Design a protein with these regions (language model features):
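Loop-to-transmembrane alpha-helix initiation sites
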Residues: 76-85, 106-108, 125-138
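Membrane-helix boundary elements
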Residues: 33-75
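Structural signal for the C-terminal ends of transmembrane alpha-helices
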Residues: 41-45, 93-94, 141, 145
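Long hydrophobic alpha-helical segments that form multi-pass transmembrane helix bundles
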Residues: 1-33
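Cytosolic-side transmembrane-helix boundaries in multi-pass membrane proteins
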Residues: 123-163
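Hydrophobic alpha-helical segments embedded in the membrane of multi-pass proteins
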Residues: 31-34, 52-60, 79-94, 108-116
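Hydrophobic alpha-helical transmembrane segments in multi-pass integral membrane proteins
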Residues: 65-70, 116-129
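Alpha-helical transmembrane segments
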Residues: 69, 92-103
Length: 163
């Protein structure tokens, strides 16, 4: 869908939402991805902070670029429902092994890095996607994010105890 949109032809938004198009297995129906995401959050297999921060940062940055007329930026909702971003935000970013796991702030930062990097790669790089690179980039910083936040909390507690 992203390539077709760049060529000037695109799928209807309803087709993207329902999955009435070609694409990689599992990423074509936004409706099913959202339902699957709701299920894994409800079952507490995934933390909603990852998903929310990824999607919010993705939509905010895409909207800023699209409405400011940046070449290569497409409609944010169309961008959300096309490609593998939504699939990755729900099922890959929430991976308990590689993601920032110990603090809610770390989860928000991790998801935001993923969402922002996906947009920047999609708009400014030569690839129509960018999800894999963005996920790897965010994973590089996951442990550092957790470490820095824990250290900051530790220093705050020590300061409060000393006062």
């Amino acid at each position: 869908p992203l390539v077709r949109q760049a060529q000037g032809t695109e799928f209807a938004l309803s087709d993207l939402f329902l999955g009435n198009m070609t694409g990689s297995f599992g990423e074509t129906s936004a409706l099913l991805i959202i339902l699957g995401g709701a299920y894994i959050v409800w079952k507490k297999s995934a933390n909603w902070h990852f998903i929310a921060s990824s999607v919010i940062s993705f939509l905010v940055l895409y909207a800023a670029l699209f409405y400011s007329g940046i070449q290569g930026a497409i409609d944010p909702v169309y961008a959300l429902f096309s490609g593998s971003f939504l699939f990755a935000a729900v099922f890959m970013v929430t991976d308990p092994v590689s993601a920032s796991q110990t603090t809610n702030l770390g989860r928000w930062i991790y998801g935001t890095i993923f969402g922002v990097m996906t947009v920047l790669i999609r708009v400014y790089a030569g690839w129509p996607e960018g999800v894999t690179f963005a996920l790897l980039f965010a994973n590089m910083f996951a442990q550092l994010i957790d470490h820095l936040i824990k250290e900051q909390k530790k220093k705050s507690k020590e300061k409060a105890a000393a006062a």
